[in-house]
Amino acid sequence: FKNMKLSNKYIAFASVALLMASCDLDKFPEGDYISEEQKEDIINGRPNLITAEVNAMAAKLNTFGTISDDATTYHNDYGIPAVSMILESGGQDLVALVNGYNWFNTSQNYSDRVYDSSSDELIWKTFYNHLKAANNVLKLIAADTEDSSLKVYRGQALAARAYDYLNLVQIYQFTYAGHENAPAVPIVLETTEPDVLSNNPRASVKEVYDLIEKDLVQAHSDLSSYQRLNSTYIDQTVISGLLARMYLLKE
């Protein structure tokens, strides 16, 4: 019985010690958490580790669940391919029956041309989520880096962001000529502070196109010596195509 009382005292003491330790919230997280500063230090020491952030950009292009949740599932919620179908269905050369499981029928009859349509939500969130992934990469790499691997990653992120804005500016405003000062879409950069995001008005068409051109020209320079493994990676040929498309749209 005496030994049991002693054991209970040890258990009580250990419980109090654990409780006190769990209440100490003033210490910096160690072990289980990695701060942004720690991540940046790691990447600067081992540039190859940033590939996870770069791969996230590609993953955002065809992800499921951008607008779906536990209450509602949209079967046309599968990223850029779905966005392409929405845009094609709004044209005159794609014919499909407006019944059954045609998830793009609202685009065919133009009833999705309202701000609260699921198609509009999918387009907006798909491009801005992909854009955020690109900004995450740019946030970790200094603009003046001389590291060859980091320059490639930065160039690919700049090209990805330009791709997003090139699509957004066409969808949410008329073409460039004659509409240079018309409101287009909000510009979000890697340097944009969180408190600005909730009060970030639409930039003009000219401002968006200027950013697209700036990003693509810099990306073209960053990828000057890059040889991609296959067509899933962004290289100078991709950027040249985007530049040509942008200049054509400005005419």
Q: Language-model features: where?
A:
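Sec-dependent bacterial lipoprotein signal peptides
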Residues: 1-21
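Membrane-proximal, proline-rich intrinsically disordered regions
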Residues: 6, 23-82
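Conserved, well-structured interaction surfaces
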Residues: 96-172, 203, 220-226
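TPR/Sel1-like alpha-solenoid repeat signature
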Residues: 158, 240-246
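Short coil/linker segments at helix-helix boundaries
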Residues: 171-210
